[in-house]
Amino acid sequence: VNKLYKEDRVKFITQGNFLIDKARDLYRLPVEAPIKYFPNPVDIDPEFDVETYPKKDSIIFIGRIESVKRGWLFCEIAKRMPEYQFYMLGQTFREKSRNESIMNKYHTGIPNLHFTGHVEGKEKFNYIRDAKIMVNTSIHEALPITFLEALAYGTLLVSCQNPENLTEKFGIYTGTVLGDGFDSIDLFVNAIRTLMTDEDKRKKLSVEGHSYV
C-alpha cells in the first residue's frame, strides 16, 4: 500500500476521523498524506418519532457469532439480568463448529435470552427500534454501521469500544476489556442497569443520539 501511495495509485478515505492516525501508522504514510472523511450512509425512518415511540425493556446484540465478538459475554449478561429481554442477532460463519460449540450451552436455561439467527431489512430494524440498548462486546472495532443504525432509532450504546467517542456520548463506555472478558461482565451489567433505571437520562441520550445521526 505504501508503494502504491508513493506511485499515486491509491487514495484514502475513512468512515471515522479516529482511524486517520491508525492508517498513517499502518501504511507508513507521511503526516501530510490526505485522508478524506466519508461518513457511512444510514437509513433514516421518516415515520419514527424518537420522543414518543414506546420502546420495550429489550437489549440487543448484532454481529457475527465469532470469538472476536465475544458473544458469550452478552449471554452471561442476560443470565444476570432476568428482568430484561435479550436478543442476539447474528450467526456463525468462520470456524462455525468451534463457535457453535462455545455458544451451545447458552441456548437453553436462560429464558430471557433469544437467538434470532441472521436477520436483515425490516426485521432487523424492528429489533433495533424496539430496543433501549445495543450491547457490543467486541475485542476491536472500526466504526460499526450498527452503532449508527442503533442511534438512528434512539437506541443507546453499551460497549468496550468507543469509536469517535460515540459510546460515551450516547450510552456508557465500559473501558477496555481484555481476553475472554469473563472478569468484566459486571461492567456491562452495571452500565445497562444505570441506563435502564434512569428513564429521564435514557430518553435524553436517545434524543441526542438520534439527532446526531
Annotate each PLM feature.
Residues L156-C160:
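Short hydrophobic beta-strand element within catalytic cores of glycosyltransferases
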Residues T194, K201-V213:
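A short, well-ordered alpha-helix in the C-terminal region of glycosyltransferases
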Residues N2-P34, V42-I44:
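A short, active-site helix/loop in glycosyltransferases that binds the activated sugar's phosphate group
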Residues E66-R80:
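A conserved mid-protein helix/loop that constitutes part of the nucleotide-sugar donor-binding site
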Residues R24, K36-D57:
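Acidic anion/phosphate-binding donor-loop and adjacent secondary structure
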Residues E100-V119:
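Nucleotide-activated donor-binding/catalytic signature segment of Leloir-type glycosyltransferases, i.e.
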Residues I139:
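Aromatic "clamp/platform" in nucleotide-sugar-dependent glycosyltransferases that forms part
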